[in-house]
Amino acid sequence: MENFKHLPEPFRIRVIEPVKRTTRAYRDEAILKAGMNLFLLDSEDIFIDLLTDSGTGAVTQDMQAAMLRGDEAYSGSRSYYALANAVKEIFGYEYTIPTHQGRGAEQIYIPVLIKKREQEKGLDRNKMVVFSNYFFDTTQGHSQLNGATVRNVYIKEAFDTDVDHDFKGNFDLEKLEQGILEVGANNVPYIVCTITCNSAGGQPVSLANMKAMYQIARKYDIPVIMDSARFAENAYFIQQREAEYKDWTIEQITYESYKYADALAMSAKKDAMVPIGGLLCFKDNSMEDVYNECRTLCVVQEGFPTYGGLEGGAMERLAVGLRDGMRQDWLAYRISQIEYLVQGLEKIGVVCQQPGGHAAFVDAGKLLPHIPAEQFPAQALACELYKVAGIRSVEIGSLLLGRDPKTGQQLPCPAELLRLTIPRATYTQTHMDFIIEAFKQVKENAKNIKGLDFTYEPKVLRHFTARLKEI
C-alpha cells in the first residue's frame, strides 16, 4: 500500500455510539450555561469531541479480551505482575507502581523527590526550581502546590508556527544548564522530559537531545522523570526524522529512550489506549529508596501498590495496550490523520503549528489578532467553533498557563494555540473534512469574535472549572 495518497484506517469498526445533532440556537445557549468553558459542557451536547485524547478513544479487541483475565486480589495480584513484566519488557524498568491516572503518579513522586533533595542536598524550598522542556498542566500544578517554581526551557523554534523543525519538543540545553547553575543544583529536585511535548503542539524530543539532557542531569546529580503519556508517538517521530534510527523498530527506540531517565510517570490513557490508568516506574535500585517511599504514599493516596486504584482487569488491559499502542501501521495511520487535518486547515488559510502527534494546533493568535492574550483568543475561538459546528476543542495558551503563584500576574504565554485533539480510532477522514469545513465558517466571521474575561477564576488549574463571559 506504499503508493496510495491516503491510507484508510487500519481497523474495522465493530461497535458504534450514536451522537446527537443540535441546532445553532441550542449550542449558543449551552455554551453560555457552561460559562464559555467547554470543560463544563455535557458530552451529549457535543457532535465531535476533540477536547482530549486521554481515555476517549477506542480499545483493541485484545485489550477488551484481556479484561477477562483480571485477578482482583487486593495484594499480590497476578494482573499486577503481567503489567510489571510489560513495563520491564518495553521500558527496561525494574520497579512499577500502578496509579489511577498520570496525576496520581505526580502527587506521589513530586513530594518524595523534593523531600529527598532537602535531606541529602540541603535544598532550600524558598529557592526551589524544577525544569522541563514544557510541563504538562497537572505536572506544573503539583510542582507549584509543593512550593516549586517551574521553568520551561524549550528551543526558540518551539512555538514559532512559521518555522518547521524536526524536534520542536527539544530542551534548550544551554538554558537548562544555565538555569541549574543560576539557582544552584541542590535546589533542583528533578527535571521532567515531556514526550511528546503537548504544550508545544505534540512536538517530539530527539534521542540526541534526551542523551544530552541526561548528561547534564547526571553532571549535577539531578533525577530525570520521563513524562510518558505519548511515548510511542515520540518513538515514531524519532524513527521518521532522526536518521540514525530510521531502521530501528518502535520497540527498540522506546527501550533506548528510557535509558536517559531515572523514572517514568505516565498517563496511560493516551498512547497505551486505556480509558483509565497510570504508571510510576523506576529504572533500577539507584532509585530504590524513592520507590519504597512512593509505595508508602501509594497506599494512602491510590491503593495498595499492586493495584494502585485499578481493578485487575484494567491492569491486564493496560499491559496489552502498552504493546498495541506501539504498532508501526497504527502509528503511521494516526500521524497521517493529523497531517491531513493540518494540511486541510492551512489550505483555507488557518495557520497551524507544524504537525506533531495526537492533535492539530491552530494558531489562534494569528486567526484572531484583535483579541489580546489577556482576553484568551484561543478560548474565544474554541467557543466559536462549538457554536458553529458542535465541535469541542481545548485552549492551550494563556488561560491554561495561568498566573504566577507568587505575584498573581498572568504568566506570559509563548503562543495562543487551539488544540484539536484526535481520539484514537474514533473519527474518520469524513470527520476531518467536516472540521475543516467548520473552520471555513469560523474564519469568515473571525473579526466579530469577542475576547473573554472571568466571572469565576480558581487559583489552581483554572482552565478546568473557570467561568467566563464575552467582553
Swiss-Prot record:
Pfam families (alphabetical):
Beta_elim_lyase
What cofactors does the UniProt entry give for this protein? pyridoxal 5'-phosphate
Q: Which UniProt keywords apply?
A: Lyase, Pyridoxal phosphate, Tryptophan catabolism
Which Enzyme Commission number(s) are on file for it?
Answer: 4.1.99.1
Instruction: List the PANTHER family.
Output: BETA-ELIMINATING LYASE-LIKE PROTEIN-RELATED, TRYPTOPHANASE
Q: What is its quaternary makeup?
A: Homotetramer.
- Which NCBIfam families would you find in this protein's record? PRK13238.1 (NF009709), tnaA_trp_ase (TIGR02617)
Q: What is this protein called?
A: Tryptophanase
Q: Which organism is it from?
A: Histophilus somni (strain 2336) (Haemophilus somnus)
